[in-house]
Regions:
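N-terminal regulatory/sensing modules of transcriptional regulators
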Residues: 1-144, 241-262
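Residue-level marker of regulatory loop/turn positions in helix-turn-helix DNA-binding domains and
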Residues: 5, 68, 155-156, 214-215
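Conserved long hydrophobic alpha-helices within structured protein cores
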Residues: 18-26, 84-105, 179-201, 220-229
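Helix-turn-helix DNA-binding segment
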Residues: 145-202, 224, 262
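Basic, Lys/Arg-enriched C-terminal extension of HTH/homeodomain DNA-binding domains
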Residues: 196-262
């Protein structure tokens, strides 16, 4: 949690939400409940949010996660890069772990450590206001209790996040090794570490562990667990598939030129 910051006057709040009705609701609510922090500055997409935040330096920014042009997570990264003292609340209908992990990594890499909150849009108004007040006035990090488990799980490395997409797209260990410039053994050890993070496994050496290894296809279960927790989504997979198609075209040629098809 960031230390208390003495903000220069005037203080303000930024609301970044692409849904016009929700944006208007938040603007009117916060202007009424926190009059000392007016004006409330509206933004309809992530790019506009970054532009306003870096120009006006609001005390608090409330960012929807899924917005046109730039996601709320990427907007927060751009804002904190120039203005780490700014407090940010992620207000979302889609609390998938792919976003939560990205937020945690950004917070961890930002100096000084920023103050932030993460809350579901379905919360009642009185709880939302208490939540905002804690971040805005007290400088407290606030996580919606419904998602505390997601924030406490082991963070995936860049390779592990990438490997999940490759598993979902059906790549073999051989292909992953070529794509990531690793040995097959290196891929196997890294995937084993990924599986340990994804699964609550049976105690090592027990009959239950032996049974589970026979009963489940680990790669398929990893894909299921990633979907269940929101560690991958269709947009990420479509982007990864397009990038892979270009890589496959280059790698097939290299494979052929190296005489490995014989």
């Amino acid at each position: 949690m960031a230390e208390s910051v003495a903000y220069p006057e005037p203080m303000s709040i930024l609301i970044a939400e692409d849904n016009e009705a929700q944006r208007r609701y938040l603007c009117e609510l916060l202007a009424s409940e926190f009059p000392e922090f007016v004006p409330v500055l509206p933004a309809a997409d992530g790019e506009e949010a970054v532009e306003i935040a870096l120009r006006e330096r609001p005390t608090l920014s409330i960012l929807d996660i899924q917005m046109p042009k730039l996601s709320g997570v990427k907007a927060a990264k751009a804002i904190w890069k120039e203005f780490p003292e700014g407090r940010i609340i992620f207000w979302t209908q889609f609390p998938h772990e792919i976003y939560i992990n990205e937020i945690r990594k950004i917070v961890k890499s930002t100096e000084p450590t920023p103050t932030y909150g993460f809350i579901h849009k379905n919360n009642p108004e009185n709880r939302l206001l208490r939540f905002i007040g804690a971040v805005l006035e007290d400088g407290a990090d606030m996580i919606d209790p419904a998602f505390k488990d997601s924030f406490q799980r082991p963070l995936l490395t860049e390779f592990e996040s990438e490997a999940l997409r490759y598993l979902a797209l059906g790549l073999s260990n051989w292909a992953i090794a070529r794509k990531c410039s690793l040995s097959n053994r290196g891929v196997e050890s890294r995937l084993a570490a990924l599986y340990e993070k994804l699964f609550t496994s049976s105690a090592a050496g027990t009959d239950c562990e032996a049974y589970d290894k026979l009963a489940y296809n680990t790669r398929t279960r990893a894909f299921f667990e990633a979907l269940r927790r929101g560690l991958i989504n269709s947009d990420e997979l479509e982007t990864a598939e397009k990038e892979l198609e270009k890589w496959f075209e280059r790698d097939r040629k290299k494979f052929s030129d190296d005489g490995l098809l014989k």
